[in-house]
Amino acid sequence: MSSFSFESSARLPLNPRFKQILHATVKSYIDTAEPVGSKMLTQQYNFGLSSATIRNAMAVLESWGLLFQPHTSAGRIPSDSGYRVYVDELISPPTELIQQMRAALAENLGERQDLESLLQGATRLLATLSGCVALITAPQSVFVSVRHLQIVHIGEGRALVIVVTDALQTRSFLLDLPQPEMAEQLETLNNFLNLQLQNRRLDDLNAAAVEAMGGEFHWYTDFLRGLIALLQRVLQPPTGQLYVSGVGEILKQPEFAEPERIQAIVQLLEVERERLGPLISPTQRHSRQIVVRIGAENPLGPMQFCSLVSSTYYLNEVPVGSVGVLGPTRLPYDRAIASVQAASDHLCQVMQAEDEPHRW
């Protein structure tokens, strides 16, 4: 189970007073969605400072680009840079919240299930826990290994192939047997294939690997080559497979009251969701860190008013898929980070769990 950490930007040298006031301003805006003034902070927080002192400090934070006024007469709200400092420097790892969410995931997703049901359930629960749009990518088949394979003769030169992977996938398909006498050798062939294929990644099973298997079944090389090709095809998830849940959550936020923003974000989440996959793809990861992209740090236009919190889940220490939540930049970051960390940990734990293949 991975420890909590997240990528951070270069730190801005803020003294304790500025940190305290920036933290309070961001937290108040996250909670209320209303611009924050010095009077509000004086009433809500026991700073031991006058309203004028707080107002001056907020003006300095604005001059540094961390706060801004949406209207001349309004209070201040955080900029993307202000949120960045808040995430990188002003909040602590939400350890207790992570533990609570891990428990919720284990309780609600505790039963052993197939991969698709697991990911669908995890996505729905992640949306509920975070209050955001939840995104989970399916494991990439190139990282998947065969755990068990069984070929069953069903008559008339046909066989049923059942395969179980270490990513909780179970698939079956029909296959022609090239020679009638092969049906009598299936038990021996099954033992041979399980010995040769077990725990080998599918992308390692190329033509050379099939040739190298050799053994007593060397005259079935063409059959083995066809079998491997079918395995790679049936275990390959659809391109850009991404599970999404909680779209309605983001539409409840005042940031998306404008019809243009609603249309853009719904178009992205419901019609063009394949564009989201690469943003949280495990190929973007170099460590087990939480990644937080805020506002303009996101490359897609509809996400310029959003924050994306994401991480990776692993299978046999290899990153195979990703978990993320998407919401407005006015995001409860501690809760978003905790939910993503907990979901990533849970998927890692389930993927690594040892069990009898036939129970899947």
Swiss-Prot record:
Pfam families: HrcA
Single Gene Ontology BP annotation: negative regulation of DNA-templated transcription
Residue stretches in coiled coil: none
SUPFAM superfamilies xref list: GAF domain-like (SSF55781), Winged helix' DNA-binding domain (SSF46785)
Top-level division of the source organism's lineage: Bacteria
Keywords assigned: Repressor, Stress response, Transcription, Transcription regulation
Gene3D superfamilies xref list: 3.30.450.40, Heat-inducible transcription repressor hrca homolog, domain 3, Winged helix-like DNA-binding domain superfamily/Winged helix DNA-binding domain
Molecular function GO labels: DNA binding
PANTHER family to which the protein is assigned, alphabetical: HEAT-INDUCIBLE TRANSCRIPTION REPRESSOR HRCA
Record NCBIfam families: hrcA
Task performed by this protein: Negative regulator of class I heat shock genes (grpE-dnaK-dnaJ and groELS operons). Prevents heat-shock induction of these operons.
Similarity annotation: Belongs to the HrcA family.
Designated name of the protein: Heat-inducible transcription repressor HrcA
Species lineage: Bacteria, Bacillati, Cyanobacteriota, Cyanophyceae, Gloeobacterales
Gene responsible for this protein: hrcA
